[in-house]
């Protein structure tokens, strides 16, 4: 619909150039066509006249009047009016929305998909949890947001690669290995001799027992077997990392999250990528030595202070491999790189970007892009749930899925802006009522399936072509409200992709479900008159399709029965 209105406005501007109202060399402005905040102001509004007023040497409202008069007639536009300082508001005819139903039916699964990305490459990194324990609910939020964002970008025509970065090097892995070794040697977290910074969850005992039993872990086709030797710390390290990576993969699969690339931090050292990044920075002239350490002049690139890259003992600070890792993304040809992180990583953003800018390789400012999420509080029975017996100190993603469902967890972890703190109410997520938004939306889809089954049971033969031809009979308030919501879907998908905000899909689906449920309660679908019945079934099927399309972008199922 936006495309139709933009075309009409463009023709009107050409007419004003032709009659001299606008200078002949006036370029069409980058005007906006958007939905007003309230329906009273029409279905769409444009600021075109306000942008052209200066060129026309006219006040915006007068030019808006001239542009309105120059607009070509269209059966899809019922009324056009001027508002405020020069906005032009369009009220669409019912035929415009009825035609959109036909577009939904024709395009099916492709309805709402766009070409904004034009096949360009984007790498989306998310979760990237240390392989030191079970995934917690914060990782779950990262997984839900990141996976849905990747789906939304794919729907906008981007060539998306999903990436998981494993921090499998450093002190945390050392602490993991020492913790498993202590368990393998018969110690418990309460014993004298337990590692000072060791991990204390019950899962450590699971890893130790599997190692001592000589179990084999199949990690993405790579077999790692426990050697049963509690003194072999290196074997324990390899086995523990493989075991816990495999556990994380199990949880992510249950959560309908997968990846194209698993990138290991250890490979950056093995393949010389860390040293390559350091040498590029030294060659750029943006480093200096002081106190036996190597420093990056990151203040030259917006950081609040210069950063140590290599300490006096020769080891690298943690942001250096981060810079090296993102350098590989650039070298792999990602036009865009998007990293989803917890808000507690905010401090690393500027220094990573500074490191990339300092290399002077033509990497754009603001590359990579970041999506930051806030923490999650889990509630049950009005009280906060803080611990998991298995993890020892936090609520795991597996716990949450087992208590509710993957659908509910994904929905609730996506459905708010990432930068807002989120409360996950287990009781609400389990409720089969309209108060539960995921139930409410899924029930709308299942309700359409139920109506189609009822039609078949009653012996009604649904003729979709007939229904499309008879949509004009659906001109009541509630039918048009559903059609209006259906027409919004492509815009919502596009905006969610531009803003990197998949939560907008969830908000939209709730509004569509509300419009559908309201229509259903106020309109008998299976009437005797075939024309009206087929038209209503066609509207229901179009709603079913858009609900399914949107739920797929969230990674939430569209059930046929509930």
From Swiss-Prot:
Protein name from the UniProt record: Arginine--tRNA ligase
Signal peptide: none
Any one GO molecular-function label of the UniProt entry: ATP binding
Family under the similarity heading: Belongs to the class-I aminoacyl-tRNA synthetase family.
Gene: argS
Enzyme Commission no: 6.1.1.19
Quaternary context: Monomer.
Motif 'HIGH' region, residue range(s) on this chain: 129-139
Listed InterPro entries: aa-tRNA-synth_I_CS, Arg-tRNA-ligase, Arg-tRNA-synth_N, Arg-tRNA-synth_N_sf, ArgRS_core, DALR_anticod-bd, Rossmann-like_a/b/a_fold, tRNAsynth_Ia_anticodon-bd
Enzyme class: ligase
GO biological process assignments: arginyl-tRNA aminoacylation
Compartments reported by the entry: Cytoplasm
Keywords, sorted A to Z: Aminoacyl-tRNA synthetase, ATP-binding, Cytoplasm, Ligase, Nucleotide-binding, Protein biosynthesis
Keyword Calcium among record annotations: no
Pfam families per the UniProt record, alphabetical: Arg_tRNA_synt_N, DALR_1, tRNA-synt_1d
Catalytic activity: tRNA(Arg) + L-arginine + ATP = L-arginyl-tRNA(Arg) + AMP + diphosphate
A GO cellular-component term linked to this record: cytoplasm
């Amino acid at each position: 619909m936006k495309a139709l209105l933009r075309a009409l406005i463009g023709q009107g501007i050409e007419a004003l150039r032709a009659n001299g109202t606008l200078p002949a060399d006036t370029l069409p402005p980058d005007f906006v066509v958007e939905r007003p905040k309230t329906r009273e102001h029409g279905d769409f509004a444009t600021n075109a006249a306000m942008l052209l007023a200066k060129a026309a040497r006219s006040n915006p409202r007068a030019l808006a009047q001239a542009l309105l008069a120059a607009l070509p007639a269209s059966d899809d536009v019922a009324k056009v009016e001027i508002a405020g300082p020069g906005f032009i508001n369009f009220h669409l005819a019912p035929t415009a929305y009825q035609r959109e139903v036909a577009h939904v039916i024709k395009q099916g699964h492709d309805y709402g998909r766009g070409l904004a990305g034009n096949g360009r490459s984007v790498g989306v990194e998310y979760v990237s949890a240390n392989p030191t324990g079970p995934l917690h609910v914060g990782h779950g939020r990262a997984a839900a947001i990141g996976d849905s964002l990747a789906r939304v970008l794919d729907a906008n025509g981007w060539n998306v690669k999903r990436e998981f970065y494993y921090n499998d090097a450093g002190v945390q892995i050392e602490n993991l290995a020492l913790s498993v070794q202590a368990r393998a040697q018969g110690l418990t977290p309460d014993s004298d001799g337990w590692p000072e910074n060791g991990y204390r969850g019950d899962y450590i005992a699971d890893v130790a027992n599997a190692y001592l039993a000589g179990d084999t872990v199949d990690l993405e086709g790579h077999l790692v077997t426990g050697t049963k030797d509690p003194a072999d710390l290196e074997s324990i390290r390899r086995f523990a990392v493989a075991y816990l990576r495999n556990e994380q993969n199990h949880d992510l699969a249950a959560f309908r999250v997968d990846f194209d690339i698993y990138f290991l931090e250890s490979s950056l050292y093995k393949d010389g990528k860390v040293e390559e990044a350091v040498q590029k920075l030294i060659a750029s002239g943006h480093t200096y030595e002081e106190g036996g350490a190597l420093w990056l002049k990151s203040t030259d690139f917006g950081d609040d202070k210069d950063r140590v890259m290599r300490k006096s003992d020769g080891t690298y600070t943690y942001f250096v491999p981060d810079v090296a890792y993102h350098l590989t993304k650039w070298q792999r040809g990602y036009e865009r790189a998007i990293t989803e992180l917890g808000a507690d990583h905010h401090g690393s953003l500027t220094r990573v970007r500074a490191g990339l800018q300092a290399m002077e390789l033509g990497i754009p400012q603001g590359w990579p892009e970041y999506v930051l999420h806030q923490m999650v509080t889990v509630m049950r029975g009005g009280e906060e749930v803080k611990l998991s017996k298995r993890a020892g100190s936090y609520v795991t993603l597996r716990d949450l899925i087992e208590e509710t469902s993957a659908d509910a967890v994904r929905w609730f972890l996506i459905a708010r802006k990432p930068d807002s703190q989120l409360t996950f109410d287990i009781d609400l997520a389990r409720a089969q009522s309209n108060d539960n938004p995921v139930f409410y939306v899924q029930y709308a889809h299942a309700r359409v399936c139920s109506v189609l089954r009822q039609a078949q049971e009653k012996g009604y033969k649904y003729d979709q072509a007939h229904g499309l031809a008879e949509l004009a009979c659906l001109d009541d308030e509630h039918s048009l409200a559903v059609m209006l919501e259906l027409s919004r879907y492509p815009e919502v998908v596009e905006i969610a992709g531009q803003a990197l905000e998949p939560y907008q899909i969830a908000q939209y689906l709730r509004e569509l479900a509300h419009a559908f449920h309201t229509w259903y309660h106020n309109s008998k679908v299976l009437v005797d008159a075939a024309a009206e019945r087929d038209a209503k079934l066609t509207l229901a099927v179009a709603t079913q399709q858009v609900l399914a399309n949107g739920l797929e972008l969230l990674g939430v199922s569209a059930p046929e029965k509930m």
